[in-house]
Amino acid sequence: MTHVFIDGSAGTTGLRIADRLSERHDIALITLSEALRKDEKARKNALNSADIAFLCLPDAAATEAVGMVENPHTVVIDTSTAHRVHPEFAYGFPEIGSLREKIVSSHRIANPGCHASGFIAAVAPLVERNLLKKDAFLTCFSITGYSGGGKKMIAEYEADEKGAYAAPRQYGLSGNHKHLPEMQTVCGLAVQ
């Protein structure tokens, strides 16, 4: 039996992971009550009792959670952006280069970003085969569903009084989007 703890199980990502794993008979979910979800001691105990710990947390909280893991056998899978380019974390995109071997042998895995994944799947093979220069000027356009904004955005869309959400809203146009470092690093692109 594999014991799994989802730190951040009440958020959009955590709820989806819990839902999928709950149907597995070979997995036992370690859960914390509502009162203990943010209790550091309870979280630390759950993290270190788990065979696999999913971090479904904001970046700062994910970094804090990794610091709580003392059990060398606990596999940590972080869904935040905090560790996607961290050298001690394998980037969880097995179709790219030697990443499959790194994922299999690692106890620290960074889950790829959804928007970054589309870009990486298209660009990394082109860079790897020298069909696209590492310093090429690229743009990326993607659209997310409302669940991509998490619980806050879902609540805004489902509220009785809705804002003007008839068309997509622009986001991340400043050239420093949070997924940019992983897109550049995994694809082997030059930082501009």
Region spans (language model):
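Oxyanion-binding "anion nests"
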Residues: 172-192
